[in-house]
Amino acid sequence: MKPRPARLEARLWASGPICPKCGTVDEATLMQGESHRPGLYQCNACREPFTVTVGTLYERSKVPLHKWLAATHLMMASKKGMSALQVGRMLGLSKKTSWFLCHRIRESLRETEPGMLGGEGSTVEMDETFVGGLEKNKHRSKRKHKGTGGTGKEAVYALVERKGRVRSHHVPKVNAKNLAPILEAQLHGATVVYTDEGATSKGLGRLYEKHESVNHSIGEYVRGDVHTNTIESYFSILKRGINGTFHHVSQQHLKRYLAEFDYRYNERMALGMSDADRMSKSIAGIVGKRLTYRRTNEAKNHQA
């Protein structure tokens, strides 16, 4: 008989079992006997049977729970991420299963209520980068027209607090129309904002009273406390992961990869988080985040 998922229960049910149907807390009976699944409870209020996995990432999954947890640990402990192929090899999963499993874990890491970054006395750097394959490696019919330095790549715009959190966004184009709503909703008005001399970032930075920029085009990278080194360091980690670990990330899935990299950065060792802490905290995100295979657009190539 499979063991009862006691550790998962302790993490998700700190105050006792929670009925997913009526919400009653700590008013359930653990069903005993060989005819019942391990960890099966019955709510004393509505009489609904349930386990700790109902309403979570793991609900109705044929993958054993210990493999879900092992895959999560592998992804949380690797600074540049781990490909689905590698996860599958290590855990004995098929290519399709490991690909979908990894995307479900990434989905659980996405922030549901982002809130504000920065604030009074806080410094935030913001900039854009571009990720994706080289145009010369694509079939002629799929190449995009030349124009900017990001031709054929996907645009990522990010905000990073000095010694704090990062939040990155996949945007269709780096312009004020796409970015202004993001800043309005996620960047506190009293924040000290540092950017480079790029037209879009500089223009948006002017919306904040305490804004300064450095001009990379003339070799100016640091001027006192004014620089964008923090966000460039994050972009370096992101690109090494995208290019070196995953090799190819499709447009429709990029937001989930960004969620993964953001999460690891926000729960990094420099902020006092160990691999075990990062893993444990990630478990809290599995509730209410069931990603179906159809929602991943049933991509044909499961390369990452």
Q: Model-flagged regions — what are they?
A:
Residues 1-304:
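Residue-level recognition of single "structural anchor" positions
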